[in-house]
Amino acid sequence: GIASISITPDIDTPKVLKSYAKQNEITHRNWHLLTGKPYDVVSQLSNKGFTLYTGKGDATHGGFEHSGLFALVDKEGNIRSRNDAYGNPIKFYRALEEHSFPDQIKELKEDIKILLNE
């Protein structure tokens, strides 16, 4: 499944996330939009669990900053990655917009198929 975790739980209530899902046509039963409090729990999960940056900031919506990256996690809880041309692990994908990073989306789709077949 897919878990999209809000970093602004005071703004992203279940009602707001439901509206967001409808607006963005997120209808698959295995895609979950999650929110929760306190912020520290969400921050710990993101920063230490997935090593994806989140933090409080003044210039961003809701006073929070985030990397915009996301990770694929297998059923054992491990972050899965592929390697670049030099053999270095690429742990994160940059965007969900196909027009912005078409190669990343293609790789993401390939990697999801691999995970689904395990």
Task: Identify the function of each model-found stretch.
Residues 1-45:
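Structural microenvironment flanking redox-active thiols in thiol-disulfide oxidoreductases
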Residues 12-16, 47-54, 72-79:
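Short, charged low-complexity intrinsically disordered segments located at boundaries
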Residues 17-18, 46-49, 85, 94-97:
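Surface-exposed beta-strand edges and their flanking turn/coil or helix-capping segments
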Residues 21-25, 52-55, 89-92:
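Short, low-complexity, polar/charged sequence segments that are solvent-exposed and flexible
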Residues 22-26, 47-51, 78, 113, ...:
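Sec-exported extracytoplasmic/periplasmic mature domains
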Residues 29-31, 50-55, 64-71:
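Structural micro-motif
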Residues 58-118:
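Thiol-/selenol-based redox modules, centered on thioredoxin-like
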